[in-house]
From Swiss-Prot:
It holds the Pfam family FtsX. GO terms for molecular function: transmembrane transporter activity. It is a multi-pass membrane protein. InterPro entries: ABC3_permease_C (IPR003838), Macrolide_Exporter_MacB (IPR050250). PANTHER family: ABC TRANSPORTER PERMEASE YTRF, MEMBRANE COMPONENT OF TRANSPORTER-RELATED. Keywords: Cell membrane, Membrane, Transmembrane, Transmembrane helix, Transport. This is Uncharacterized ABC transporter permease MG064. It is found in: Cell membrane. Signal peptide: none annotated. The chain crosses the membrane at residues 373-393, 487-507, 534-554, 579-599, 653-673, 1206-1226, 1255-1275, 1297-1317. Belongs to the ABC-4 integral membrane protein family. GO terms for cellular component: plasma membrane.
Length: 1331
């Protein structure tokens, strides 16, 4: 047996090429599998670790409650001259449905909060009493607000507890710091949802925010009972911890105070409280600002303070994606956590001193506010760190995420009160769908969201415009699944090919050694022993290939991870080298190779010795070779000989042909898809090349009438149009002595008398109104009533939009100061934050408002001061002039750089449109959308919302934009790049439709196909809903063209068709008045304004339709009373009241007289028909072309990278196989080559004969590869479409087929050269002797 093994080892030298090839195949198979499998496992492990450890939420709830104005008034029966106290009561028009619900739910608590009694504090002067009353109104409002905002029975948190859900509040603030976007995200170590997962360093410490809140409550409790009752208060309450905190944080110099506090802690009966009482005197204040509590009091005319701070507010965790970049800048995680814990125990002054000493490399700065980096981590809701709705492609250099605890957040938030914030409740629901339905049903009655926005939705819901979490979490699983799919396919393919090739190589080797095998059997050795000795042939490549392949796969994991670095931001551990893993793969490969060797060997060694030796001494032509030779009987002998050679080894020929076909198929796929993504993106971009954004709006109803519009810069101006359907009401009153107000009759500015009356009496008080913070954010007082209209306005705005209005307000005032410091400083106050050195701007109310009764000190502020009103309208006029500015100049404004504001002003003598607008039934449009039109925006169009095959779809009813200059509309083109827009505007007897490639693919549509759509946004849908009929409209369309765009299904029809299907009145068609969508190159309509739309056509100053809403009930009563003649004669002649009555009838769908006794029935109808809310957000969806392109590019690049890796691995393997098998095939003809050489044939002629085997290879290879290439390319297109909704029109071209054949020919030419070199070495006499 030993001799047999030695003989096999010696014979290996002649098969070195085959051994190298087999070793390489095993190396690639094992290495590829280990690398790709480990990469997928590593990604999955990292993602699952973050999502499971961090407890990823599956639901989001956006809260929005209508607390109302919370305005209190003094009860009229108070006798200020004789009584020591007074009572404040919540005004009737402040009692929203939410507050009324609170009164029903918990009357014992809220009855005492809507009516509160206060002391005059022994004051006798009328002015002093008035001041106390005004201060008490603020306190009463705060008391009620605090109770409402924390009452779980009223808020959604109570509903979540009933559902046994785990939840928490998510909060983040966006800050622009020197052109770098920074997001500060709140995280606490005890978070049960979306908690931080730490990869390096330490987690954040728990904040003291709850301790601060408790301390504040206890302070207010003690102070409210009076300093003179301090001893009694301390005896009856549990205030030891409170007093201990005061003692701990009081300065060491306050020896007397600390001594008295210490005595009170041990003995509440202590009589030494003189200095402690000062802390609770009337002038003392306790504020919670900047992450610390500051208690200030006056003692002997000196202001003193105790600062209770939270050192953990100085800690931060950096997101790992950003940390990779920060490390390049020299940043490090603070390593000495014990020292940090020691520093945190120091008093404030010492703490700040020690904090300053810490090297800056351990800190990050948020606009000069330093935080110590104690760790690196991520929460599962930011695994794909999308920064904001306008920045959806992560950029680790310019978009930075930092985690801080609650007090750490307050440190920065207090300096950026006007910056955009993200807030929501994130939750893990047990029964997701049913729990979401439960919450949304509850929210309809208890929240004030528009009907087109759900309060609660799934974290993965990509259709919700408020859901950024979907973009942050959905992409990663899709990426992993794609890699996993490719890895599985590639591994199976390589292993299959490796096994097949191994079989062929072993057969070739055994046949090549037939003579030796025959001699051994003739000498009496059994076939089993010979077969076992041949195992060594498979063991060497198996062991070497498996070990090197496994090592390669383990060693190159980082390279594979880096391949996806543009999309992968989670720290990912690589699998370590494992002896067990190595042994497993080695034994697995050895087992396969041994099995193949034993199987092949047993088949060959079954033959009789005589037959083995006989067949070895002659060249036997196969039956296929003989048969094929007969087809060429009329040709010469050499031709017939070459035909016989070509078909002599049929199985090898079949395999070689298959491998060649496979090679050409892969090459054809590579060539065909080389630019397919770019072509698809180019065609898609062509459709939307003329605009950057597409806005979808609320659709008009018979009740609402048309949505009104103005040039954005002119929002609020007096409307001079004559077309009644689109003209605004112009119903605001002028300001006497201020001529400019006549030009701004739709811009609401403060006027107490008209606003108080309108709020309480006018059902359409807000119709066509345009509001802004600068015009309304003032507290007006008259007869002990205080009103601030902007508070009401903010309750109607989503939190992020209210925050955006505050940011815009700051920018507006800053711009005014920048261009005209002297005039601006007359009315604008600037205060500098001591920490960040940033300026905070505010209107000086004392100079902005009139005081109509200065002599008696009652502070009856009723209207704007005339000088300020002139100043205010001059700013509106400056903004109006910016309507001529280019988008490039508007986008160039940088509020951190005042020079850009000056440059804009110098160029246009205007201010940018900085004033954030809140508008009702009117929307501001960019000038390019309007395009000089008067009654309808030129690039406004109609969108049909409907359903087809149980899938929601949108059909865009576009206009016939023939001009090419400044055309914002879509460019529709067919596969020949011919513009086909005009196909929609021909005269048809049917409704035409153009679909894009994706829609045609998804719904199997072609030109001539008909589809039936159930449209749900028709003009008369509310009419049908009122009478409980189906609001859907069925429409049938016929496809007249297929547009080239390739991403997501798109449908287009003509404006006239959409107009007809939506059932608009015919008189509106001539001027094309209706529109519910528009194209634009600016986001002004969204980022600089909030537009609200009423489907009912009524515009009350309230945010809900509910029988509990006393404001609404009273308004309806007063509107009905007008008709019943119960109002005075002067009012009864008011045409607006008549109009309000008619609009109410239309909203209710009642043509007969309304009855006062049925008010609650009418409110119930409004609640049912309009889903409980008077207003929808006018803007329902925005399509961002650049963002869509970026998403398209991300998907395309990821897919292309994976595809490139696959092809780069497969092609070399297959080519090596072809080279090896073809060489082996020719080597088997070596004995014939010797005889032909002896007959005088040259090496070239001999090789030419042998190369005849390539003729059928090419012929059959092409026959097989072409149809299968077509199928493979189609399959590739199908997979891409199914996974990403991208339609690729990759196809097999003649050039691709020729190119792949030439590549194959180049590989086979290597065989020609190698065999030619070997033939030159042959010595005829020696070879004949050996044979």
């Amino acid at each position: 047996m030993l001799n047999l093994i030695k003989n096999v080892i010696r014979s290996l030298k002649s098969a070195k090429i085959a051994l190298i090839a087999l070793t390489f195949l095993i190396f690639v198979a094992v290495g590829g599998f280990v690398l790709l499998n480990n990469t997928v496992n590593n990604f999955n492990a990292a993602f699952n670790y973050v999502t499971h450890t961090g407890k990823l939420s599956n639901a989001i709830i956006n809260e929005r409650y209508d607390f109302g104005k919370l305005e209190f008034q003094e009860q009229t029966n108070n006798s200020q001259n004789s009584s020591d106290s007074f009572t404040l009561t919540l005004t009737n028009d402040s009692r929203t449905s939410f507050i009324n619900n609170a009164l029903r739910t918990n009357p014992s608590l809220y009855e005492g909060l809507v009516t509160q009694t206060f002391s005059y504090q022994n004051k006798t002067e009328m002015t002093e009493k008035t001041n106390i009353v005004n201060q008490s109104k603020i306190i009463a409002a705060n008391n009620l607000n605090n109770a409402l905002s924390k009452d779980k029975q009223l808020l959604v948190s109570g509903q979540l507890e009933k559902l046994n859900a785990v939840f928490r509040e998510y909060k983040a603030i966006n800050i622009t710091d020197k052109s770098v976007f920074k997001k500060l995200i709140v995280s606490e170590p005890n978070d049960l949802v979306n908690s931080l997962v730490i990869f390096d360093g330490q987690n954040l410490s728990s904040s003291k925010q709850s301790d601060f809140n408790n301390f504040l409550n206890q302070f207010n409790e003690i102070k409210s009972k009076g300093k003179d009752n301090l001893s009694t208060t301390l005896k009856t309450g549990q205030y030891q911890a409170f007093l201990q905190t005061l003692f701990d944080y009081a300065q060491a110099s306050e020896t007397t105070l600390k001594d008295q506090l210490q005595k009170l802690i041990s003995n509440p009966d202590s009589s030494e409280t003189n200095q402690v009482k000062n802390l609770f005197d009337t002038p003392s204040t306790l504020t919670n600002i900047g992450g610390q509590l500051t208690l200030q009091w006056t003692e002997n005319s000196l202001t003193k303070q105790i600062v209770i701070f939270d050192p953990s507010s100085y800690e931060t965790i950096v997101a790992p994606g950003n940390w990779t970049y920060q490390q390049q800048l020299g940043k490090e995680v603070y390593p000495d956590i014990n020292n940090w814990e020691s520093i945190k125990k120091l008093p404030l002054e010492q703490f700040e001193s020690e904090f300053l000493k810490i090297d800056q490399k351990y800190k990050i700065s948020i606009d000069n506010i330093d935080y110590l980096v104690i760790g690196v981590g991520i929460s599962p809701d930011f695994v794909y760190p999308v920064f904001s709705a306008s920045l959806i492609v992560p950029n680790i250099e310019n978009e930075q995420l930092y985690y801080v605890n609650q007090t750490g957040y307050e440190r920065t938030f207090s300096s950026f009160l006007t910056n955009p914030v993200e807030t929501a409740i994130v939750a893990r629901l047990i029964n997701l769908e049913s729990d979401l339905n439960t919450i949304n049903q509850w929210a309809v009655e208890n929240m004030s969201w528009p009907t087109n926005i759900k309060a609660a939705y799934s974290s993965s819901d990509t259709t919700n415009i408020l859901n950024l979490l979907a973009a942050r979490t959905v992409f990663i699983p899709n990426l992993i699944n794609t890699i996993n799919l490719v890895a599985l396919f590639l591994t199976i393919a390589i292993l299959t090919v490796a096994i097949i090739v191994s079989i062929l190589i072993l057969i070739s080797y055994l046949k090549k050694n037939t003579e030796q095998i025959g001699i051994l059997k003739a000498n009496g050795l059994s076939g089993k022993k010979i077969n076992l000795s041949l195992l060594i042939f498979g063991l060497i490549p198996a062991i070497v290939g498996a070990i090197s392949g496994y090592s390669f796969g383990i060693g190159f994991q980082d390279v594979a991870i880096h391949l996806f670095s543009n999309y992968w931001f989670i720290p990912t551990a690589t699998s370590s080298f494992s002896v067990v893993g190595l042994l497993f793969f080695s034994l697995f490969v050895i087992l396969i190779m041994s099995s193949i060797s034993l199987l092949v060997g047993s088949i060959i060694l079954k033959k009789d010795v005589v037959k083995i030796l006989k067949h070895d001494s002659e060249f036997k032509v196969s039956r296929l070779g003989l048969s094929s030779k007969k087809l060429f009987a009329r040709f010469g002998i050499m031709t017939r000989f070459r035909v016989a050679l070509a078909f002599n080894a049929p199985w090898k020929l079949v395999f070689l042909t298959l491998m060649s076909s496979f090679t050409m198929m892969i090459l054809n796929l590579s060539f065909a898809t080389k630019d397919s993504f770019e072509n698809a993106q180019s065609k898609t971009n062509l459709t939307n090349q003329n605009h950057q954004y597409e806005f979808e709006l609320a659709s008009a109803t018979t009740q609402s009438g048309l949505l009104k519009w103005q040039l954005f810069a002119e929002l609020g101006t007096t409307d001079k149009r004559s077309e009644s359907s689109v003209k605004l009401a112009n119903k605001r009153m002028d300001i006497s002595n201020v001529d400019a107000s006549k030009d701004w009759k739709n811009q609401q500015v403060i006027n107490f008398l008209s606003d108080a009356s309108g709020f309480s009496n006018d059902l359409n008080y807000l119709e066509n109104i345009v509001q802004s913070k600068i015009g309304l954010d003032y507290s007006l007082g008259f007869n002990n009533i205080v009103s601030n209209p902007w508070r009401l306005s903010e309750t109607l705005m989503p939190t992020n939009q209210a925050s955006a209005s505050n940011t815009a307000f700051q920018n507006f005032l800053k711009a005014i100061i920048t261009i005209n410091p002297s005039q601006g400083s007359q009315f604008i106050k600037q205060t500098q934050d001591p920490l960040t050195k940033r300026f905070i701007y505010a209107i000086d109310s004392d100079k902005a408002l009139k005081n109509n009764n200065e002599q008696n000190g009652s502070q009856n502020h009723l209207t704007l001061n005339d000088d300020f009103a002139k100043f205010l309208y001059s700013q509106f006029e400056l903004i109006k002039k910016s309507g001529n500015a280019s988008n490039e100049d508007l986008n160039a404004i940088d509020f951190e750089n005042p020079q850009t504001i000056r440059d804009f002003y110098n160029k246009y003598n205007a201010l940018p449109p900085l004033d954030y607008k809140l508008s009702f039934n009117v929307i501001g449009l960019p000038k390019e959308t309007i395009a000089g039109q008067i009654d309808t925006p030129k690039y406004g169009f109609l969108t049909l919302h409907g359903e087809y095959q149980n899938t929601p779809i949108k059909i865009k009813g576009i206009k016939d934009w023939k001009d090419k200059v400044d055309n914002l509309g879509p460019v529709l083109s067919d596969q020949n790049n011919h513009i086909i827009n005009q196909e929609l505007f021909k005269n048809y007897s049917f409704d035409p439709l153009i679909v894009n490639n994706s829609a045609a693919k998804k719904y199997q549509l072609a030109i001539g196909s008909e589809i039936n759509i159930a449209v749900n946004n028709s003009f008369k849908r509310i009419d049908n809903k009122i009478i409980n009929q189906d609001p859907l409209v069925n429409a049938t369309f016929r496809v007249v063209g297929i547009n080239n765009s390739a991403h997501d299904p798109e449908f287009f029809t003509s404006y006239s068709t959409a107009f007809k299907v939506l059932e608009y009145p015919n008189e509106w068609f001539v001027k094309k008045l209706p529109f519910n969508s528009f194209y634009a190159n600016s986001l002004l309509s969204f980022v600089q304004s909030t537009s609200l739309f009423s489907e009912s056509g009524i515009f009350p100053a309230t945010s809900s339709f509910s029988t509990n809403n006393t404001v609404l009930v009273e308004l309806i009563k007063k509107t009905i009373n007008y008709k019943n003649g119960q109002m005075n004669q002067t009012s009864s002649n008011d045409s607006s009241k008549k109009e309000n009555y008619q609009k109410l009838q239309k909203a209710l769908g009642i043509s007969t007289d309304l009855e006062i006794s049925k008010v609650n029935e009418y409110v119930a109808i409004l609640a049912r028909v309009y889903n409980g809310l008077p207003y929808n957000s006018t803007i329902s969806f925005i399509s961002n072309v650049a963002a869509n392109n970026a998403l398209f590019g991300n998907i395309a690049n990821t897919t292309k990278q994976i595809q490139a890796v696959v092809i780069a691995v497969i092609i070399p393997i297959i080519m090596l196989i072809i080279l090896l098998v073809s060489t082996t095939l020719i080597q088997e003809l070596k004995k014939i080559a010797i005889r032909l050489k002896a007959l005088g044939y040259s090496n070239l002629k001999i090789l030419a004969s042998f190369l005849s085997i390539y003729i059928p290879l090419f012929a059959f290879g092409l026959l097989i590869s072409i149809p299968f290439s077509i199928y493979l390319i189609a399959l590739h297109n199908e997979v891409i479409f199914a996974s990403s909704s991208i339609f690729l029109d990759a196809f097999l071209s003649f050039e691709s087929a020729i190119g792949s054949m030439l590549v194959l020919l180049a590989v086979l030419s290597i065989t020609f050269v190698l065999n030619w070199l070997e033939l030159n070495k042959i010595k005829i006499d020696k070879e004949i002797k050996n044979s």
